[in-house]
Amino acid sequence: VRPVFLLSFLGACLSVATFAATDPLERLKSFSEFPAVDLRRLHAGDILGEPGSLMNFPQGISAQTCFAVPVTAEEAAKRLLVWDPSAHETLKAIAFHPVSEPCQAVDFQNLNLRSNKRSFLWLLDKTRATTAGESELNLTRDEARQLADCAKENPDPQAISGCWAKLLLERVTEFQRRGFSGVPPYEATGETVSPAAQLRAMLREQPTVAGEFAPLLEKCGVLGDEEAATLKPFHYWGLYEANHHATFVLGVVYLLPLGDHYQLLDAQYYVSGTYYTFVTLYEIWPTRVGEKSEALVWRGDFIAAPTLAFTKGFDRLAYGAIMVQEVKKAIRSFQDDVKVKNR
């Protein structure tokens, strides 16, 4: 059962202003990798997928997908806003939890690293190996010092879980105060990396996509004047397996109603290791095929990771193709959840 605050949050997000109705197929032609879309095939279950064009930004790749779900556009937006992927083992989402605003220590009470799984042991080992001056994890220098002292005091997995809970709580608190401008950089690996700057760099690589989502990106403070950010997000924390590594993430999902259609941004503004940030954009329209009414969804995914800086040409294209397949897995899982709830 979802907390009551989610229900009130959804109601506030779906207060709709008046905009002219849009032709989704014309919109897709204007900004996406899909100049022609067969709605009947999508309604029958097909998922379109294409790797994004190669970026000049050395650490990023992207992918675009398009699919349909058998609910209204409004309902699809509501479900994507708070969708929990952890029920699907193939998605490697170990845990997923909503975070209240203002956040509280109780939001992280289920954080537990006690496990014999290889992915957990990697995170525990890297946490214990962290020093005040160095870490393989994505931390500020102060966080590295804090985590090193905490783990040295008690290296037990349960105690280390508490160390991480405190660190994540502090990061969420800072984001809730200052938004993307308050996201601290990663420093402990020896170079300074801003996940917020990487997010913006990837979006600027695809100006037609950034232009399509300008209303949303400006209202959540990703692009333009951050002082103009007015949207309230859904906050969450998660624990994922990324490249066999247990990886904490802190994320936000913003929803902007635009008349008959909706835009969403799901941004992981903190990732504990393996990659830097992951961003997903959605645009959702109402469509009809015969007597059937469904939601048409365009999805764009962007990931920044240090290993991508060493890939070029064919290797980078291969990563993009793999990304499309992984995104399709997540879409299938979401579609399955929608179908189950509609029974």
Predicted regions and their residues:
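Bacterial N-terminal signal peptides
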Residues: 4-17
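Terminal "cap-and-tail" regions of soluble proteins that handle hydrophobic small molecules
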Residues: 21-75, 81, 85-343
